[in-house]
Curated annotation (Swiss-Prot):
GO molecular function: transmembrane transporter activity
InterPro entries named in the record: ABC_transp_permease
Protein's organism: Salmonella typhi
Protein name, entry field: Autoinducer 2 import system permease protein LsrC
GO cellular component terms, A-Z: plasma membrane
Keywords on record: Cell inner membrane, Cell membrane, Membrane, Transmembrane, Transmembrane helix, Transport
Subunit structure: The complex is composed of two ATP-binding proteins (LsrA), two transmembrane proteins (LsrC and LsrD) and a solute-binding protein (LsrB).
Function in brief: Part of the ABC transporter complex LsrABCD involved in autoinducer 2 (AI-2) import. Probably responsible for the translocation of the substrate across the membrane.
Keyword Oxidoreductase attributed: no
Transmembrane segments: 14-34, 39-59, 72-92, 93-113, 115-135, 155-175, 213-233, 249-269, 284-304
Localization in the cell: Cell inner membrane
Amino acid sequence: MLKFIQNNREATALLAIVCLFVFLGALDSQYLSVQTLTMVFSSAQILMLLAIGATMVMLTRNIDVSVGSTTGMCAVLLGVMLNAGYSLPVACLATLILGIVAGFFNGVLVAWLKIPAIVATLGTLGLYRGIMLLWTGGKWIEGLPAGLKQLSAPVFLGISAIGWFTLVLALLMAWLLAKTAFGRNFYATGDNLQGARQLGVRTEMVRIMAFSLNGGMAALAGIVFASQIGFIPNQTGTGLEMKAIAACVLGGISLLGGSGTVIGAILGAYFLTQIDSVLVLLRIPAWWNDFIAGLVLLGVLVFDGRLRCALQRNLRRQKYARFISPPTPLQAEAKTHAQQNKNKEVA
């Protein structure tokens, strides 16, 4: 059972989604509808994009806790440029470039300057959040053009243009990681850094690429955020980094690097967003969201750690079982007699 869960984390995440969907349907029959599925998917798009980016970084055995601030900073740039009169394509392109540059800077700190990823991205978390607040003066950005909001309007099967773009992007990244040398380099770097170098993989560039892609995904998440709500608060992106990491771990991405898929991360993001629906349906106050998200992250990490320990014990047992042969009947009988004689001597 444990081996099945470990080897089929995507199926496990999908099963969790179905079970939660059925549970909510039992509480309220109106929840069992296609409209509910698309509504949850629409709410999950930001987290899905961040989970795709986090997957790239975590596969290389790193972590990025600055993506929430990167998302907020990119959303602010988008709003500032749109309100300054720039066209939507130009503003979106500049936003995407800013996200990639922010991710590239993180990658340089980690790969070239050899700063631990958690330390480097904690620093840039504050840096990017500070830049965001300096741009806005601590104020919200409002009055965004209708063209931006139109990106999140349903176009087909109740899913917006941004929603379809997110699905296509997820499938593309899943294919790149699973079927190309480009993707295999990420797995090799995270699984065995020295071994990957001996095979000719440019591990520093792979890690910088991972952080850069992560920054690009954060920029896309900022665009989606602005298009969905129509304004940009000064706390945009706060706490999203923890949810992105939780979604990845829930979907089977290892914190030790080298294993997991984008599809699993997407399913993990959908499941976490579904939990928010539970809070709404059960009329639980919104300020419980962070507590629930932290609890889920902690639970997933504990479960993942215990699962790996159990599997390692099983592997060791199987590895050395052939060296430990069971005692023959004569050996067992001799051992019993020896124990009986020892007991008599003690008596």
